[in-house]
């Protein structure tokens, strides 16, 4: 990693740490999210929602239809809030990427939600272009490509649209931050006119560096632009089996002490990252992969994570996102729910 990259990331870490301890970021997390409980009762401080991605295998294999997701979630898991994923109700556009299906389809989605007394929390939005694209024309297309998803989120009564802060990874961190900040600000300004939040998940690349992402959100400077901390998404680079590609991608972060390498890739500390992102959080994603005999997640200490969430003053939905491959999706979701319920009672 070159000196400029190290200096920028070091400044970001120092700024985030100073602001967090000084209380600069507390307002976002201490406010109840739209639709969330504002009671002081610790028993209802957190509510469980289900991220649709937890069921992605069944959806992609045709075993579950997108329209049946609300009913299935309620009847199978006794969960009453859902987080949609745009990959399951899109049409492809030549320049704008994934776009929502037509209004009649969205109306049927909304009807299914209402028929079963469910709550739509947010839409997770992917493959709509990079909001930090260095090409100004493509960056504008990415911003405008998200507009229809804002309309869909508003129609479905969601409070937020989850997006990605992605740029050209070969650029230095400061340039990537500036580009992502511009795209996020433009999209958030549009969302504000609709009463919606734009929230960024740590989702690979520099967005999985908690200090970098927190600094980018701070630079946007709008109250409706926040984060969706994901307990398990702190790999800046994943090892997907292609040795040459992995070494090339990993070289961009060489010499940076914030990252540790394991068999899955190059990772930022998940607890530090969550702590850095929580002051801006308008949602929380409880990522789970594997469990031990006692029902604990083997990669993430859920008690430690939920203590961080609680200490940030957060109230609202905590979304189950089961992504393991050792258990079936139903069992994995059930185990994650049981773990969260146990941990909620502890913290």
Provide a role label for each language-model segment:
Residues 67-87, 157:
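Catalytic domains of carbohydrate-active enzymes, especially glycoside hydrolases
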Residues 1-17:
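N-terminal secretory signal peptides and thylakoid transit peptides that target proteins
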Residues 41-65:
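Boundary/entry segment of secreted carbohydrate-active catalytic domains
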Residues 63, 81-82, 175, 181-307:
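Acidic/histidine-rich catalytic cores of soluble enzymes
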Residues 60-75, 140-151, 266-274, 302:
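Short, acidic/polar
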Residues 12-25, 29-42, 71, 106-229, ...:
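Active-site acidic/histidine proton-transfer and metal-coordination neighborhood
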């Amino acid at each position: 990693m070159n000196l400029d990259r190290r200096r920028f990331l070091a400044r970001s870490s120092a700024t985030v740490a100073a602001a967090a301890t000084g209380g600069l970021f507390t307002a976002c997390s201490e406010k109840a999210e739209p639709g969330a409980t504002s009671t002081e009762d610790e028993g209802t401080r957190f509510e469980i929602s289900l991220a649709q991605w937890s069921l992605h295998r069944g959806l992609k294999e045709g075993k579950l239809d997108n329209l049946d997701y609300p009913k299935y979630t309620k009847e199978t898991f006794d969960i009453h809030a859902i987080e949609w994923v745009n990959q399951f109700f899109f049409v492809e556009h030549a320049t704008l990427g994934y776009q929502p299906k037509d209004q009649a389809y969205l109306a049927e989605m909304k009807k299914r939600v209402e028929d079963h007394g469910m709550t739509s929390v947010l839409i997770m939005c992917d493959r709509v272009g990079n909001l930090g694209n260095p090409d100004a024309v493509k960056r504008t297309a990415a911003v405008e490509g998200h507009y229809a998803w804002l309309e869909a989120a508003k129609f479905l009564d969601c409070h937020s649209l989850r997006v990605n802060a992605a740029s050209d990874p070969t650029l230095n961190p400061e340039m990537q931050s500036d580009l992502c900040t511009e795209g996020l600000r433009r999209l958030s300004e549009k969302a504000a006119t609709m009463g919606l939040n734009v929230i960024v998940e740590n989702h690979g690349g520099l967005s999985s560096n908690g200090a970098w992402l927190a600094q980018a959100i701070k630079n946007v400077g709008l109250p409706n632009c926040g984060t969706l901390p994901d307990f398990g998404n702190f790999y800046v680079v994943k090892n997907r089996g292609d040795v040459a590609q992995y070494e090339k991608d990993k070289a961009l972060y060489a010499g940076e002490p914030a990252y540790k390498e394991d068999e899955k890739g190059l990772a930022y500390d998940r607890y530090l990252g969550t702590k850095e992102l929580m002051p801006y959080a308008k949602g929380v994603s409880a990522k789970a992969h594997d469990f031990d005999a006692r029902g604990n997640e083997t990669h993430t200490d859920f008690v430690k994570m939920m203590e961080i969430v609680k200490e940030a003053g957060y109230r609202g939905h905590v979304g189950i996102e089961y992504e393991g491959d050792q258990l079936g999706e139903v069992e994995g979701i059930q185990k994650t729910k049981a773990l969260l319920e146990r941990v909620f009672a502890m913290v």
